[in-house]
């Protein structure tokens, strides 16, 4: 990942990058995207400075990845009747999440959901389609990006 003068180690989807992203394909979508918002665990990161809209992650929050739901690719609250990914995790990968504006306007069913920039596992293990970076680099990015910042994935 390159940002201004910084070269940032990252992990991507375990099946690579694609222009034909589909739900569950374990691929990172190719294209030019913007950042929508920032979600974070206030119990783990009490103060966060960002020009993005900030959302505090609560225990009952998730992201719908079920294309049969009208809430597909949106933030939801549990209990929820459709499949959704929990955002409150014991591991730290979702302590900070930057929502990438992929498949948002319009939302196309089965096109892919929950594409985030989040914290990488210690060994930079591949993701299910997200981009993951170190916590240190995440702090650097969140202090400098805003909704106009472009993310180019190719």
Where are these regions (language model features)?
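Cell wall/extracellular polymer interaction/catalysis modules
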Residues: 1-128, 135-154
């Amino acid at each position: 990942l390159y940002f201004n003068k910084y070269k940032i180690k990252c992990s991507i989807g375990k099946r690579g990058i694609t222009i034909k992203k589909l739900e569950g394909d374990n691929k990172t979508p190719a294209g030019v995207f913007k950042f929508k918002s920032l979600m974070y665990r206030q119990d783990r990161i009490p103060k966060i400075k960002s020009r993005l809209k900030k959302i505090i992650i609560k225990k009952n929050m998730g992201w719908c990845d079920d294309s049969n739901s009208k809430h597909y690719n949106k933030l939801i609250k549990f209990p929820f009747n459709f499949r959704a990914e929990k955002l409150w995790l014991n591991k730290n990968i979702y302590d900070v999440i930057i929502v990438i504006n992929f498949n948002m306007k319009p939302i196309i069913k089965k096109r892919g959901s929950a594409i985030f920039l989040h914290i990488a596992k210690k060994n930079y293990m591949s993701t299910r389609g997200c981009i993951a970076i170190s916590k240190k680099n995440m702090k650097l990015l969140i202090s400098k990006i805003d909704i106009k910042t472009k993310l180019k994935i190719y």
